[in-house]
Amino acid sequence: MDIHLEDYLSAGYLITQFVDDASLNQWMRDVNHATEDLLPSRILSVGFCGASFAPIFKWVSPLVEDYARFGIPENRISELTSWANELFDKEIGHPNLFFRLRTAREYIRRFTNQSSDMQLLGIGLHQERLHQVHELEQGRPGYVSETGAKVTGFAGSGFAQALRLKESPERGEILGFDVVCLEANIDHSWHCNGLAVDAVGKFNFYPNQFGLIDNKSDADKMADYAEEIESEDGTWLPVLVTRYPLTP
């Protein structure tokens, strides 16, 4: 995979797990008329609604089970909450993005049991797509609700904040491209809409062993197609996905 990282900006780092994909393959057969399993048995995604992401902020109401899934004992949640609140908008963004790899690794070291099923992923956006992020920020500004609550626009999302640092993604194991839909944050991936069926039928490519897209050209086609058919409200973008060891 010929990727020039200097052409990309980091959109943050997150901690997730593999997603068991049997039900999604069956759904694509039942609803999207797929004639074969198009995805591997387990996938990785930075935006799939069925994926689990490591909980960071208590005010987004994670369950105790969410912490346990990532090996965080209940007696450490209070310390994690204080740490995360201190770093909010400085090193960590809403809802689950670390601006830098070192902060994600600090989270893993301090609060988790470093279980082998955790996956530390980085998100990269090609600079040619930055204008779409700017348009999204302009189209979804912050506002004050009728109750007086301050509602952050897209510019206040962790994704947008990380991009404004203008840092290249850290070097790691490049897994491929995800295609994600942005509205308030990263709200969906192309798998939320079964678009692997269109990848095969319209664009003649299959997802790779991670459920991602192997090359930028196909990822661009899929993002533009999802935008064209308006499969979700929001802006569709192809993002580079890189995997890192949990510890340096």
List the predicted regions and their residue ranges:
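Acidic, proline/glycine-rich low-complexity IDRs
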Residues: 218-248
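A short, highly charged, low-complexity intrinsically disordered segment
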Residues: 206, 213-216
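Short amphipathic alpha-helices within nucleic acid-binding modules
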Residues: 100, 104-108, 215-223
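Extended amphipathic secondary-structure runs
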Residues: 98, 104, 116-118
